[in-house]
Amino acid sequence: MTPPVSKIWTGHGKVPVALIRTGWDKGEGFYVGIKGGTASANHAHMDAGSFVFEAQGVRWAQDLGMQEYYSLEKEGVRLWNGDQDGQRWDVFRYNNFVHNTLTVNGEKHQVKGAVPILATYTKDARLGASLDMTSLFGSNLKKATREVVLVKERYLQVTDQVQAAGQPASVRWTMVTSATPKLLDSHTIELTKEGKKLHVIIDSPSAAAFSVVDNVPSHSYDAPNPGSVRIVFDVDVKAGRKETLKVRLVPVVE
């Protein structure tokens, strides 16, 4: 099969996605998946704004995937109540707290929020997409956009621009990984997996600091998540103010 000419494909359906692939041989190039959409879609999770990232044949930023429905239904979980306060969103793998997206004021995403792809970048120097995430956060934020871009086929850059509404907002940045994390400094985490390394670097804001959170389930009915963690940082945004969260994922070439 002949590889496609374009290194990026974008779909603008109810659950819009942008997919980047720069190589077609095993272990070669980069793979990026960027997801918009809505939790109100059939079988959806609260994962709008999420991304996955693969480099050097290693999946660095991952999605834990769904939990098998029967394992929840046999425990009496009201899985098909998809209202804002429905029990579906208490399932560990289904809400936004354990996806590679933003969380504001510790709250779940708005079920009826819908994240469109605003723009797609198709040049080799910048491959990626931007998303409007505003509707996920209700009255907590006035504006929120995310840009996920593969820069010069060297590293992935994730840029979030947020503006608080009429009250302060606490914004959490999250990335799920099955790599082994090592904190090099407050702004840099080194991930190691399958003999390869990746640096995750906070470029902005300067006061932000990484921490590592175990993916220990919240309830007895939740599936275990062995070998995976979340790397997170929190940013406090004053009422009405704007803030930029900028993170680089840089493969270490040795």
Regions found by a protein language model. Name each.
Residues 61-64, 69-73:
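Cytochrome P450 core scaffold surrounding the K-helix E-X-X-R motif
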Residues 71-254:
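CBM-like, beta-strand-rich accessory domains located in the C-terminal region of large
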